[in-house]
Amino acid sequence: ITRESVIRNQFLIDEGDPYNEILANKTLNEIKSLNFFKDVDSKIIDDDVNKTKIINITVEEKPTGEIMAGAGFGTDGEVFEIGVKENNYLGKGLAIDTNLSLGSDKVTGEFNIVNPNYNNSDKLVKFGLRASEADRLSSFGYKSKKIGGLLGTKFEYLEDFKLGIETSSFIEEMETDSTASNRQKKQEGNYFDTYISFDFDYDKRNQKYQTSDGFRSYYSVDLPIISDNNTVTNFYNYKIFNELYENNISSISLSLSSANSITGDDVKLSERLYIPQKKLRGFAKGKVGPVDGTDYIGGNYYAVINLSSTLPQVLSNNQNIDLGTFLDVGNIWGVDDSSLDESSELRSSIGLGVDWFTPVGPLSFSFAHPITKGKNDKTETFRFNLGTTF
């Protein structure tokens, strides 16, 4: 059962403040955006004796645990993912998340704890542990192991503007064999890296839950404190929402990222950039961009534009299914050896997405058709994810 303090922390109105209907409605939406409740309702009561208004909030609890399983099928094999997440641990609003991804040559595990209101300070605090192992000795001549953790906080610095600060440390071991390229052999050895990260989040969306208007601008930078390669990573995303017609939600998103060494060293394989699969649908995860032999090594830069629009008039009688279209356009380029550059090859895809809320949990499908691609890119026309709650 959710603690009352968790609900009260979402209020944008304090006791004794003049009543503001706009803030009252935003408060209701903030509670809904927690995704802890099946139903949220409010009732305003006039207290004629004290000349005040009483806001009564009624909520209906729902399961907040999730078990997620996902799989992808494409031209380059399969990827399986499984995760367990509790979004409201002990009713305190704490999020505990574990995730395991099993690929044909890589295993990644994560454990994260997020407290959105640490010690009633209105500051988010998070802690995480991560480990990964990429075994590509038989195919590409190298193997890497990486383990470490992070600690960070995020808080509202100005109205609608949040500042995040995070520190992370990782130990990495990389080994190669005779089949590895010279670039990979140069990176063989042990590494210890400590970074400090900053993120700046300007959020002018009308609501976090089912956003239909407004925009969000987000920038983050990772700066090396202790590092052998001294890589600086930048990321920027801008997304704007609009309702083109009744019940429709359309959005345009721009994402930019870069990774470069400030001391002129080669960027480590594990720090190179890959376009996130959710931003370039229709392509296999990590199988886009510069190739060293037969190994996809990522790039120093990427840029992606995403256009999406819901289709509320289709299956309008079924409240459990959301249907939408999308167009993804992106490019990834730049390597420390310019002979491998693929900056001229633009990738794009068009497709259909389906979110189906079934009795066993949310089920999502993605059908994508690549329009343009690089000569070495691997495609993935269909992907699904299945989750359940507890």
Roles of regions detected by a PLM:
Residues K53, E246-F326, G334:
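Extracytoplasmic gating/loop element in the C-terminal half of outer-membrane beta-barrel translocons
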Residues S217-A259:
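Acidic, glycine-rich loop-and-beta core segments that form the ion-binding/anion-interacting portion
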Residues L28, G74, L254-S258, D322-I332, ...:
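Active/binding-pocket-proximal capping segment
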Residues I13-P18, E342-S344:
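C-terminal soluble interaction/assembly domains
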Residues I1-I13:
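N-terminal periplasmic "start-of-domain" segments of outer-membrane beta-barrel proteins
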Residues I249, V329-I350:
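Outer-membrane beta-barrel transmembrane domain signature
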Residues N87, S343-I350, V354-T358:
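Strand-loop-strand
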Residues N20-Y218, T231, N242, N248-S250, ...:
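Gram-negative/organellar outer-membrane beta-barrel architecture
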